[in-house]
Amino acid sequence: MKTLKYSWRFLMRSKSYTIINLLGLACSLACSIILMRYIHRELTVDTHCIDREHVYAICTNTEGNRGLSGLKQYNYDTISIDNRFVEAMTTYIPLEKDYVISGTNRIPARCLVTDSVFFQLFHYPIVQGKLSLTTPQSALLTEKYARKIFGNENPIGKVLRYSNGKDITVEGIVGEPECKTTINFDIILSSKLSQHWERMNTELYRFLPGTDINAINKTGSVPRYINDPEYDTRTHTFSLISVKDIYWDGSLTDREPAMFLSGNHSHLIILSGVCLLLLLTGILNFINLYLVALLRRGKEYGLKKVFGVCGKTLFANIWIENTLLVLSAL
């Protein structure tokens, strides 16, 4: 206890040293912690997917144009994935510039068209109602979007007019996952609402354990005709890309920038380096300032040793002083 009191008295007496050292270390730690939180959030994108490393999307390459798509819309000279290896399969269609009508108000909406299997692969917290698309008219709204349309009213059972002229019924309200997500939307619609959508869907697969993904990619690397080559000589190839990797390939999702987020590994590496440098700078600055203070207190420590203070007590003084500074900075 005496050692603690002495250490505290020294820090209070040397106010300039304490303030400068404390501010330097606090700023360094604050910046490092903020950067580390950002880096961690980037590295945990889409962890709401039940198995993001083993849920795959179809990436097609048509004459150099890469994008997320599906195989079932290619009807000529193509190959499908053997259902014996598939544990779960779903599709989704992103509609970035869509809208719904509530009363007389036309409200822009980012719509995601899918089916109930989607929720077997991606976990979304349910805030109100139920998380299902049991009927073609079923719709799920995000909590933020529901508040935008209905305010504080109960949105469950409310009817909206979709852009194709059909009515949709709000069945549930979904919350935001704790992690950052690649796909962002306002409304989830049932794929059964219409037989004809304005764009092609993207297929997602979860394969059974032991499935040879490399063999599927090898098969997909063989060019195949999109249509009858007598009229259309274009070819396409396909490969599987995991949900974990989609976020890091912005070229696949840059057509819908308002619905899809993407990251950059190079930026993350640079930020990691900056974070490390900030942390090292703060630590070195802390050590240098304390060494200067230690040199100035050389006579004081010498007198203490003359009066019988042991080395362990002096070390405890130094250790407690630094611990108090670090804890204060944090």
PLM features per residue range, with description:
Residues 4-20, 24, 284-325:
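Intracellular coupling helices
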Residues 14-41:
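Short, strongly hydrophobic transmembrane alpha-helices
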Residues 25, 29-32, 273-283:
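Hydrophobic alpha-helical transmembrane segments of multipass integral membrane proteins
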Residues 28, 325-330:
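Glycine-rich segments within core transmembrane alpha-helices of 12-TM secondary carriers
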Residues 32-154, 162-169, 199, 218:
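Structured, solvent-exposed hinge/loop segments at the ends of secondary-structure elements
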Residues 55, 200-204, 298:
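Short, solvent-exposed beta-strand edge segments and adjacent coil->beta transition regions
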Residues 115-127, 139-263:
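Mid-to-C-terminal secondary-structure elements
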Residues 259-278:
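N-terminal membrane-entry
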